[in-house]
């Protein structure tokens, strides 16, 4: 279902023959006890919701029902109306899959959310911890639940074609089948309480910030179509549509995108969007180059494209291009595997390589953003230490947003601010809530992960401070994380190197102590777009081996360490890939490195200088000198902030 309005009926069923069974897992064996940390994320009682859902499952002859996190566009962050997984499970993290059988319910999520999920899931649910040895994957758990020829159902608009095929193959081995259920069953349970779809106005993103006209971008895409002899490209990723057409929106919190689809063929561009979202300025911007069509007509039009192609004697072998992240429903509407070529999106690849205008904007917005952060941390220390004020985590986050909002070209936050004191910092994607969050303890570690949206760029920065006297353990852990951050920032590598290959640089010092962190080291960042952007990144994900880093990529460098129930440490800078000069040119190939653009001091009293090498101390002192040089002018009339900045950027030595 697309929002509250279903598309044309989808009745695709994949049936399979019985085969060998997977090992049986005890459903409750993998549940975990709730960790103790000072936040109040009470579990929602899901008993009635699950009972209603199971009744609908019986009516639709479904034995196991899958509820993904994503919307119809496979978005990581979604509009409130698409929060189906949170509604049915009570878990509010951004990543996870809910699986409901007629007798059991499980939630699979990754290491960022283990603590949060354990707290928010009630006793109806089993927590499946991804990547933990001995814990079944979501697919394994589904397959076990479906043994004996049972039927697994999913809304085909919420799962990719690749994921559907992979699950189908696994189910075949256990004698089960997968069906697409066009009417989303969770929506039926949610009923009138489900939030309305967003109706925000779309805005033009001027070329002075985009660096390239949308007509040029479409022309580049058509060259890709020509090279592949493709009938067209059907685009479903919201940030790709926004980037391609130089438009921005407000349909998804913190992500300046708008709910839409787009089809580009060799002769036309069609944008599928609710017309009421388009202002006269946007329509003038698009002009005659883009045809506007109703959002709901995408599936019917996709099917019509397929039918027309079948009748075209000149294009019997041409296929439609579709992102490998597009929905199963869209794939099937275009005729399925025989008529669709699923690829890594050429728009995603192009968007990840920022042009010179975008890179200049990223540098500029990070300086302004750094000024806001510096003023914030100086204010926070003064309030806690000198004034002995009582501030909770939300009070602090609100102050940071206020300071950011004063900066030129500010357009909002890029994600919910993670303002966390003491043990809350160990919850990697902690979200403080007014009334239940903690009072900031000046004698505990304070971790703040935050970011801003600016017309000329997007920021994402984490800093960890201690406003009292840190313990030796805290200082050692912080310094090991800092060494990893410096190691990645300082890397020089040949063209063709992937982020997967560089990940060890951020972890090696922790590994030597038998420590690690359960999240990626770096993710791509959009230019006044989504704060999480593919296809490049730094980490152990297989997809990070597929696309080598290239000049113009903008990514995060964010190693961390988390002591459950005690504290969390993370240092995050945004870095840009650039070509560097080396003494030698082995193989005559280009060599690459990084340029950091985040401008905010790194907490000095948490550093143990004896653990740093001479080159690491030089890096830190050079970095702090750069922060001072680029930001001190903002505080000529602010003595408190200026003195704090002077202290926090002073050179250190062993």
Curated annotation (Swiss-Prot):
rRNA-binding keyword on record: no
GO biological process assignments: proteolysis
List of residues binding Mn(2+) 2: 449, 460, 572
Matching InterPro entries: Creatin/AminoP/Spt16_N (IPR029149), Creatinase/aminopeptidase-like (IPR036005), Creatinase_N (IPR000587), Pept_M24 (IPR000994), Pept_M24B (IPR033740), Peptidase_M24_C (IPR032416), Peptidase_M24B_aminopep-P_CS (IPR001131), X-Pro_aminopeptidase_P (IPR050422)
Cofactor(s) the record lists: Mn(2+)
Note describing how the cofactor binds: Binds 2 manganese ions per subunit.
GO molecular function annotations of the record: metal ion binding; metalloaminopeptidase activity
Enzyme class, spelled out: hydrolase
SUPFAM superfamilies: Creatinase/aminopeptidase, Creatinase/prolidase N-terminal domain
Name under which the protein is recorded: Probable Xaa-Pro aminopeptidase P
Source species of the chain: Emericella nidulans (strain FGSC A4 / ATCC 38163 / CBS 112.46 / NRRL 194 / M139)
High-level lineage: Eukaryota, Fungi, Dikarya, Ascomycota, Pezizomycotina
Gene name of the record: ampp
